[in-house]
């Protein structure tokens, strides 16, 4: 039993080993068959490649022969086998190659080719052209050789590459083709690396063309073929590309225009800043001028005034209607030293720069006079030290005569003398003492400046006197009276040379006296004659005036006032009823009886009450809005009048998030209007029981503002103001007040503040 089982197991084992050996031999035979089949496929592939290379080489040789390059055949490529077992081809291939070479040789040595080759030297024009053709042929051969080598390397690389490398090469080639296609389609760089398998859109057909059949059917072009659709899409893409270019060009043009506008705005801003800077400079100069005047006032008040302070006070008194200076400005130089006058010249220059030419003539004349006084003082100092070594232009004996000639002359007369001296200096001459005449000219300039200041001082005094008489109601003569000129007799007419006396010469001793006599005698005669004529005219005129005045007083000698009509009243006249006048009189008597300031009127009390509690953030607000076309029924009984008012506007800073971010307490934000306080004065209301009212109306021209109108009743007209249109705060805790007491209507309110809440 055990023997049978062992024999069965052995036989089963032998059968199993036999099956395994058979299966192993079958597998080995299958693998060997696959290897042989692969080898045969490779050999067939290599054979096809050799044939294709031979065909390409034959075609290239034929092209060489056609181009005339038969002297040298192109190099034959040496093709290598992949396995490297044998370097020679089969007999059939060798015979085919020999036959091809024989055929090419026969073609190359044909009579036509020899004739063309023999005729080609005859066609060559020059050795230089032949050398150029030879170099061109050599460069062409070099390019062909390089291309053949590159092709050989590519073929060799393809022959030895593995299937994975081949697959990678084809994929790279395909990707390059797709990339070129995407570039042609106008894809950007960010979408250039997307593929069907690698894209963030999850689209497996990303690179494929999407065909929207429904849209094509709707457009009626579903019958078109794929090629026609592609052409149509290309045209659409080209149109889109052109449109994008136009849009880009327009965008660039807009950016250019924007840059130009910004540049223009910058230039305008610079001009505004320049104007602002100019205004700031003017304000700064004005500030320094005011400070200089303030310092002058302080020094004058403390009794330590400088000459420039007195001159500044004099020139500022010309603009003042009440201040009067009785002395000429050059009298302030009396008693000054040379150092004081030099300081005065510097101060005058400062005032001329600060005033910017306002009183340039005055300061220029004062400079001339000061320089003349300085030169005189220096001459005195030099003469006090010892005898002068050089001649001073005018002799001391002649100087007094010159001063007497210049003294008492008007500015116009001195100007005539000045022109005559200048003409004499320009004319010149051999016996002309130039130093004398130049010194005389310098003195004459100082006398002209004094005469101009004297005439200006007289004009200012005359104008001040005229204004004072007008204010006091005193009748006076006109400021510029019309003088009646009487015809002069021939005996009293002056000759031209006597009208302008000539100053004495440097060498004449009796010249000054003669000139003075010649110039003074006719003048005195004329003066006497004029005085007599004027005295007679004034006497006649005064008598006529007295007679006319007495007649007027006789006609107007009434002690009761004349009754006036309504048309004769001025527009701003206030008409009072007898009862109202009596009431005012009694009120005035009561005010005199009570203790206190009797001169304080009801309006003063009103303004004093209205100004109480006025803070720093409040300012007076008196801009009234005109009301036109308003007619009152009581206008025929009472004369309408405007009420008095004292309004205040409350301004302040609003520290919201924006202002807290961009401003601080040192650089605060701009102030805004936060409220108003209206105080309207109605002391003479006819109906004391009617309370004044206010009406808030919309502003027609601007929605940001509103019209606040107050209505009280006779005899007061309505009054309106333009305010900011914001919501009011009606709570008394926030300062709202609307009351009428003691003839004063008060309306105080603040605007609501909108706070940011999350």
From Swiss-Prot:
It comes from the Eukaryota. Keywords: Coiled coil, Cytoplasm, Developmental protein, Immunity, Innate immunity, Isopeptide bond, mRNA processing, mRNA splicing, Nucleus, Phosphoprotein, Spliceosome, Ubl conjugation. Residues 108-140 have a biased composition (Low complexity). The keyword Cell inner membrane does not apply. Residues 55-65, 155-178 have a biased composition (Basic and acidic residues). One of its GO terms (biological process) is negative regulation of NF-kappaB transcription factor activity. It is found in: Nucleus; Cytoplasm, Cytosol. The modification Phosphotyrosine is found at residue 559. Induction: Up-regulated by TNF-alpha/TNFA (at protein level). It holds the Pfam family CactinC_cactus. Residues 1-140, 155-181, 477-536 are annotated as: Disordered. GO terms for molecular function: RNA binding. Residues 525-536 have a biased composition (Acidic residues). Antigen recognized by autologous antibody in patients with renal-cell carcinoma. PANTHER family: POLYGLUTAMINE BINDING PROTEIN 1/MARVEL MEMBRANE-ASSOCIATING DOMAIN CONTAINING 3, SPLICING FACTOR CACTIN. Interacts (via N-terminal domain) with NFKBIL1; the interaction occurs in a pro-inflammatory-independent manner. Does not interact with RELA NF-kappa-B subunit. Identified in the spliceosome C complex. Interacts with SF3B1. Interacts with SDE2. Interacts with SRRM2. Interacts with DHX8. Interacts with isoform 2 of TRIM39 (via domain B box-type). This is Splicing factor Cactin. It comes from Homo sapiens. The gene is CACTIN.
């Amino acid at each position: 039993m055990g023997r049978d089982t062992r024999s069965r197991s052995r036989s089963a084992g032998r059968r199993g080993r036999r099956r395994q050996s058979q299966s192993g031999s079958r597998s080995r035979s299958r693998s060997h068959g696959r290897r042989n089949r692969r080898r045969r496929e490779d050999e067939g592939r290599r054979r096809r490649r050799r044939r294709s290379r031979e065909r390409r080489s034959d075609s290239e040789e034929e092209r060489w022969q056609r181009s005339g390059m038969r002297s040298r055949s192109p190099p034959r490529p040496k093709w290598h086998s992949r396995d490297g077992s044998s370097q020679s081809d089969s007999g059939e291939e060798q015979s085919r190659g020999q036959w091809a070479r024989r055929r090419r040789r026969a073609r190359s040595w044909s009579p036509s080719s020899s004739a063309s080759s023999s005729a080609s030297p005859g066609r060559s024009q020059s050795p230089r052209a032949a050398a150029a053709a030879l170099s061109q042929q050599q460069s062409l051969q070099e390019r062909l050789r390089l291309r053949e080598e590159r092709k050989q390397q590519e073929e060799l690389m393809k022959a030895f590459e593995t299937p994975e490398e081949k697959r990678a090469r084809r994929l790279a080639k395909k990707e390059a083709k797709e990339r070129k296609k995407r570039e042609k389609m106008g894809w950007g760089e960010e979408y250039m690396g997307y593929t069907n398998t690698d894209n963030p859109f999850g689209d497996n057909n990303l690179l494929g063309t999407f065909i929207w059949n429904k849209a094509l059917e709707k457009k009626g072009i579903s019958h078109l073929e794929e090629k026609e659709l592609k052409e149509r899409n290309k045209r659409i893409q080209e149109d889109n590309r052109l449109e994008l270019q136009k849009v880009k060009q327009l965008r660039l043009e807009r950016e250019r225009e924007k840059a130009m506008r910004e540049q223009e705005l910058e230039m305008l801003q610079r001009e505004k800043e320049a104007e602002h800077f100019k205004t700031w400079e003017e304000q700064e100069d004005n500030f320094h001028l005011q400070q200089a005047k303030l310092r002058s006032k302080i020094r004058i008040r403390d009794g330590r005034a400088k000459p420039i302070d007195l001159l500044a006070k004099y020139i500022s008194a010309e603009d003042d209607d009440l201040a009067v200076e009785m002395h000429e400005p050059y009298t302030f130089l009396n008693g000054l030293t040379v150092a004081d006058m030099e300081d005065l010249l510097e101060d005058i220059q400062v005032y001329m720069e600060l005033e910017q030419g306002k009183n340039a003539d005055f300061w220029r004349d004062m400079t001339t006079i000061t320089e003349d006084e300085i030169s005189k003082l220096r001459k005195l100092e030099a003469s006090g030290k010892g005898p002068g070594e050089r001649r001073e232009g005018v002799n001391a004996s002649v100087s007094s005569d010159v001063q007497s000639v210049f003294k008492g002359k008007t500015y116009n007369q001195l100007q005539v003398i000045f022109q005559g001296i200048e003409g004499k200096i320009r004319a010149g001459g051999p016996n002309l003492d130039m130093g004398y005449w130049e010194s005389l000219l310098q003195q004459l300039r100082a006398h002209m400046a004094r005469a101009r200041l004297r005439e200006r001082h007289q004009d200012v005094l005359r104008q001040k006197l005229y204004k004072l008489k007008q204010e006091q109601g005193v009748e006076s003569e006109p400021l510029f009276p019309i003088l009646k000129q009487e015809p002069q007799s021939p005996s009293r007419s002056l000759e031209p040379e006597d009208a302008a006396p000539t100053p004495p010469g440097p060498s004449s001793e009796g010249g000054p006296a003669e000139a003075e006599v010649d110039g003074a005698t006719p003048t005195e005669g004329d003066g006497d004659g004029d005085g007599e004529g004027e005295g007679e005219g004034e006497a006649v005129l005064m008598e006529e005036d007295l007679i006319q005045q007495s007649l007027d007083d006789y006609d107007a000698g009434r002690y009761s006032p004349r009754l006036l009509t309504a048309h004769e009243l001025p527009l701003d006249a206030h008409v009072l009823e007898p009862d109202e006048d009596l009431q005012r009189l009694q009120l005035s008597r009561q005010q005199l009886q009570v203790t206190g300031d009797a001169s304080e009127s009801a309006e003063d009390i009103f303004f004093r009450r209205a100004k109480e509690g006025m803070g720093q953030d409040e300012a007076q607000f008196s801009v009234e809005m005109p009301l036109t076309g308003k007619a009152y029924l009581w206008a025929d009984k009472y004369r309408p009048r405007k009420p008095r008012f004292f309004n205040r506007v409350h301004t302040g800073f609003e520290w919201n998030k924006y202002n807290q971010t961009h401003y601080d307490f040192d650089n605060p934000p701009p102030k805004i209007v936060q409220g108003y306080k209206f105080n309207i004065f109605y002391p003479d209301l006819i109906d004391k029981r009617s309370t004044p009212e206010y009406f808030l109306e919309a502003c027609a021209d601007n929605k940001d503002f509103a019209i606040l109108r107050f209505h009280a009743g006779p005899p007061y007209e309505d009054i309106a103001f333009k305010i900011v249109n914001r919501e009011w705060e009606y709570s008394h805790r926030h300062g709202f007040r609307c009351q009428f007491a003691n003839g004063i209507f008060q309306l105080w309110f603040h605007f609501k503040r909108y706070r940011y809440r999350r």
